[in-house]
């Protein structure tokens, strides 16, 4: 049991950090520092908030494991793991929808006053292989977009599984003993 909580906590912190990073780099397409590419949408916000929940839950798991008898820490872990479980399907759905709709191309087809969002122009799902350079600026934005969405799909699935494992373990302990904090941690 000692290894499960440590592994789950470290996994939640690491993958939550990757999710926050994924949402943060989505602000700047293809690492462009042009301010007019900066955007804010649910595609960006969802990985950041879900990652923040996972990092918080993982940090609390690691802290609660060290201070085994602190009941308030285990209750906070339980709460944030539930929130993470609820956020992961939303994160997965947004990433899947975003991958199927295609990239939000800036200044495409007709210069500065371009079509902007190509999801209304091309077929559904987005034909990544048929139009290799639909987004004129920034270059390689289709590959960048698809890579970020696949990363978000994988992260949300793994975060869901790890959060669910911690939730099941804590629920089993709650049903067995009647309280959420376990016996003294031998160190």
Swiss-Prot record:
Membrane-spanning segments: 11-31, 42-62, 76-96, 106-126, 148-168
Main location (coarse class): membrane
Membrane topology: Multi-pass membrane protein
Subcellular localization, as worded in the UniProt entry: Membrane
Top-level lineage group: Eukaryota
Cellular component aspect of the GO annotation: membrane
Keywords: Membrane, Transmembrane, Transmembrane helix
Protein name as annotated: Transmembrane protein 212
Organism: Mus musculus
Underlying gene: Tmem212
